[in-house]
Amino acid sequence: MARLPCGIYFETYDKERAYIRTKPQALFLVLFFIGLLVAPFLLSVRFVSMMNLTMITMICIVGLQITTGYAGQLNLGQSAFMGMGAFVASSLTVHFHLPFYLAIPAGGLGGGLMGIIFGIPAYRVKGFYLALTTIAAQIIFPILIMRMPASIFGGSMGFHLDPATFFGISLDNEFKLYYLVMPCTVLFVGFAFNLVRTRIGRAFIAIRDNDIVAEMMGISPLSYKTAAFFIGGSFAGVAGSLWALYIRYIAVDQFTLWYSVWYIGMIIVGGMGNILGAILGTVFIRSLEEIITTLGPYLSQHYPQIGGGAIWLAGMNIILGGTIVLFLIFEPKGLVHRWKILKASYRIWPFPYS
């Protein structure tokens, strides 16, 4: 009980705004980061692979949370921004032999610039019409890649990449790639947590709540809406660069509108307007996908009457879509709302939370 904070325990605003406000929080974070460092030594290759894919997706979803959850700009082109980052990084790696630690930021810049191009109309349109504008990114992206000379973006064949190397070490397996993906994820998620606490983050929230009032207060909607798309696109571009280095083959059919819709679904499940919500939503949906993928072949083998792989592919989409609908109906604030209730209950234990 001596370690449990209760009542009014913040004496200054700085303490209230601090990242780590209690000793249990500090202990949890230390154990969490130790767990991240030793995880590949304790887990199977398949589980490490799942963690790598989840963390790459997480970077993309955190960027989408900044654009949509904080700035209120509905973005259905995140997959295209991710694809642009992947193709830029791959082109620089294959044609110019740029090392991965330079190709990844370049991919982020490519995704961010594409975000600016399709984010500028956000100054004039919003809601449904803005969604249509960002869908245009998904339509234009594959046409652009296919029409450009194959010597630039690989054309219809895409790119085959060699394993990245770092000081002579080839990053050619899940274990080694984990120690590339994990630090990048920690860096960008940490940046996002800090960003939304700054003046820029508060401006995003003001524009989301009421852009007219925000403009009257001296906030430039054009500047901040464009910045939101640039930041979100940059996160997606970095995720795309990591994706390309991870699977070592990319093509335009890996970055379709379908994935952009699922990305929106992840922040709905996790909770809009909260970086932790993006993290929880990504982990939840990716874990659910893995469970369905694991159970599908087993059930098809033991119960052949239910159908084969195609049935389970359709079933996965139905289950994931149904999950999102259930969250919209029964938990519209997402998993992060449950987490906040859990924290509040912990702080006042043994008294009931109401």
List each model region and its residues.
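Transmembrane alpha-helices and adjacent helix-loop boundaries
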Residues: 1-354
